[in-house]
Swiss-Prot record:
Post-translational modification as stated in the protein's UniProt record: One or more lysine residues are methylated.
Function according to Swiss-Prot or TrEMBL: Forms part of the ribosomal stalk which helps the ribosome interact with GTP-bound translation factors.
Source organism of this protein record: Edwardsiella ictaluri (strain 93-146)
Gene behind the chain: rplK
GO cellular component: cytosolic large ribosomal subunit
GO biological process, any: translation
Family stated for the protein in its record: Belongs to the universal ribosomal protein uL11 family.
Protein name: Large ribosomal subunit protein uL11
Keywords of the record: Methylation, Ribonucleoprotein, Ribosomal protein, RNA-binding, rRNA-binding
Record has Ribosomal protein as a keyword: yes
Quaternary organization: Part of the ribosomal stalk of the 50S ribosomal subunit. Interacts with L10 and the large rRNA to form the base of the stalk. L10 forms an elongated spine to which L12 dimers bind in a sequential fashion forming a multimeric L10(L12)X complex.
Length: 142
């Protein structure tokens, strides 16, 4: 018989830097999960990814307090900021432009995000990423 799912916990944790401090500790502690076991497994799985990049993770907690987790690709906004070389997006994206990204960079980000995004094809996903870039105050160039 399959294990009974107790809860799903969604977090964003920096790649290779999971530790028992908030937000990881309290979120998993409430479910009775072995926090250090999760931290070691997560850090091992994300050691090939650039350290410090926020990685969304969905942790499935079972009734016997065991768990499994699925890592996703970093948020599009984080990848866009990295590509444009800016620290944060614009507070007034329609007035103040903070950086530039090329269509090639946008397409590359769309290909990276393809596993997690719903879209007909890479072009549709690239248009979605362009919209995110514009809403952050980034200019998309050809």
């Amino acid at each position: 018989m399959a294990k009974k799912v107790q809860a799903y916990v969604k977090l964003q944790v920096a790649a290779g830097m999971a530790n028992p401090s908030p937000p990881v500790g309290p979120a998993l502690g409430q479910q009775g999960v072995n926090i250090m076991e999760f931290c070691k497994a997560f850090n091992a799985k994300t050691d090939s990814i650039e350290k410090g990049l926020p990685i969304p993770v969905v942790i499935t907690v079972y009734s016997d307090r065991s768990f499994t987790f699925v890592t996703k690709t970093p948020p599009a906004a984080v990848l866009l900021k990295k590509a444009a070389g800016v620290k944060s997006g614009s507070g007034k994206p329609n007035k103040d432009k903070v950086g530039k990204v090329t269509r090639a960079q946008v397409r590359e980000i769309a290909e990276t995000k393809a596993a997690d995004m719903t879209g007909a094809d890479v072009e549709a996903m690239a248009r979605s990423i362009e919209g995110t870039a514009r809403s952050m105050g980034l200019v998309v160039e050809d």
